[in-house]
Amino acid sequence: MYVEILDTTLRDGEQTSGVSFAMQEKLGIAHFLLEELGIPRVEVGSARVSDGEFEAVKRICQWADEKGHLGKVEVLGFIDGGESLRWIKDAGGKVVKLLAKGSVRHVTEQLKKTPEQHIA
């Protein structure tokens, strides 16, 4: 049996109440996960969250590219007319995890859009 590990500490872990990593901490965690533990996939952030998130993702992507790990670094993007994809590309990311609303109810009630508007 094959099991592939995806670590989400730098993205999902930071959503925990009271948890916030400084840029150097994020870079250190990425280094530890990819080089020390050999984790094959690391989700490092969410597109369009903040300028600080952009700088952290950019710095991690630069380091990962230098070390040959860029294909293992993933960034969460959204269905938003390509804005997330541009953000991730500008930060140096190469692997996008795309998040879309999973039901018509979420689209119409939370986003206040039609399904056609959501996927456009």
Q: Which residues make up each language-model segment?
A:
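Glycine-rich, proline-tolerant flexible connector loops at the mouths of alpha/beta enzymes
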Residues: 38-64, 76, 100-113
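Generic structural signal for well-ordered alpha-helices
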Residues: 30, 54-61, 82-85, 119
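N-terminal glycine-rich anion-binding loops that anchor highly charged ligand groups
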Residues: 2-7, 24-43, 47-56
